[in-house]
């Protein structure tokens, strides 16, 4: 497994990262909404109260069936910076966001779901980084996930900024084949976003594909040590609507396929990155297969589906990092694999390694 480290193009110390951007640069916050009237006021307020930037809030309602449009009208009447877009046809979150992008006037743009919020000073921190580095088209930081009441505290003092070459960041994402960004913590340079195009019609991986497309066209910045957004987890949220593992694998594969066959990048480089991502996804699928064998679920429709997926992306499974373990569990069979001490220890190490990678991602953004 590749190391989760990148050589930074540039770093900025705390003393400079804490300086607000000069001249109040303009930011468009595009809030997409469907039946979230109860959350809208908090989301809009979190954007309107941002300091050191000139904010416009574009609320795109996707033909909600609740009282969202009334709430939006009241919010717009109370502050001229709120611009409603009321869709006449329900088109889903991708179409709603793209409508907001088309209407945006800001130098920078943030996509905010109606149930999420920006932390105090979030936009100023991200904009400060982007203003220092004109080649950066994507800035992100740490999102805080919460249930219930909105948190009252957040880390608002950055410890620094880190900038990576977009191609290096993208290569690591392909090597790991995992999305490291939630969404509300992202700030995009509007000119770069419009150059690469808006979101594409993927079910759950539309944001992941967009982040990678931006990285293919620009450098990537990270606000270190600060919380950039609050992401609400609740039963109705899109992110909380559980996607089964196999569907998630397929949708990530679709995102890589769509990105690297769109003709917008270098053909040779895109082909290499697609092979890298496909191998990583296939390796993840056979890892889940071996873990299932150790848990007593080997040689089942579940593992058959994982292996079918893996072979579709990378036919020679023996060449993958987990290929030897796969051969071992298949040779032993479900019962013997479940009783194997060495396989059990290996499964524990695999799980601990995944937990460490998650913790590292939360700390470094990678």
Model-inferred region functions:
Residues 109:
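Short aromatic/hydrophobic "clamp" motif used to bind/position activated sugar donors
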Residues 61-70, 89, 113:
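A conserved acidic beta->alpha catalytic loop
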Residues 1-22, 175, 233-366:
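C-terminal subregions of glycosyltransferases and related glycan-biosynthesis enzymes
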Residues 45-54:
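Short, acidic, metal-binding catalytic loop of nucleotide-sugar glycosyltransferases
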Residues 161-252:
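Conserved nucleotide-sugar donor-binding catalytic segment
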């Amino acid at each position: 497994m590749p190391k989760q480290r990148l050589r930074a193009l540039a770093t900025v110390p705390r003393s400079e990262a804490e300086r607000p951007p000069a001249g109040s640069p303009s930011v468009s916050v595009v809030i997409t909404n469907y039946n979230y009237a109860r959350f809208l006021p908090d989301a809009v307020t979190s954007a309107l109260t941002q300091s050191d930037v000139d904010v416009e809030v574009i609320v795109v309602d996707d033909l909600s069936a609740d009282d969202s449009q009334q709430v939006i009208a009241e919010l717009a009447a109370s502050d001229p910076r709120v611009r409603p877009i009321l869709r006449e046809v329900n088109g889903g979150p991708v179409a709603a966001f793209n409508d907001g992008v088309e209407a945006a006037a800001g130098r920078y743009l943030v996509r905010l779901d109606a149930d999420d919020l920006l932390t105090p000073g979030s936009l100023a921190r991200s904009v400060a980084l982007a203003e220092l580095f004109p080649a950066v088209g994507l800035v992100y930081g740490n999102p805080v996930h919460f249930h219930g009441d909105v948190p009252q505290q957040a880390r608002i003092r950055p410890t620094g900024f880190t900038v990576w070459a977009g191609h290096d960041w993208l290569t690591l994402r392909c090597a790991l084949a995992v999305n490291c960004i939630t969404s509300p913590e992202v700030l995009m340079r509007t000119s770069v976003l419009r150059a690469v195009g808006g979101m594409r019609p993927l079910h759950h991986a539309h944001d992941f594909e967009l982040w990678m497309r931006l990285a293919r066209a620009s450098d990537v910045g990270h606000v270190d040590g600060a919380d950039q957004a609050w992401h609400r987890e609740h039963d109705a949220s899109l992110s909380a609507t559980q996607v089964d593992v196999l569907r998630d694998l397929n949708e990530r594969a679709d995102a890589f396929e769509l990105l690297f066959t769109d003709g917008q990048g270098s053909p040779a480089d895109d082909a290499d990155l697609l092979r890298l991502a496909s191998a990583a996804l296939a390796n993840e699928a056979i890892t889940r297969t071996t873990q299932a064998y150790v848990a007593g679920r080997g040689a089942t429709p579940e593992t058959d589906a994982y292996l079918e997926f893996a072979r579709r992306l990378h036919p020679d499974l023996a060449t993958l990092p987990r290929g030897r373990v796969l051969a071992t569990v298949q040779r032993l069979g479900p019962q013997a694999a479940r009783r194997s001490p060495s396989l059990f220890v290996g499964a524990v190490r695999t799980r601990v390694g995944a937990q460490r990678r998650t913790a590292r991602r939360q700390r470094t953004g990678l």
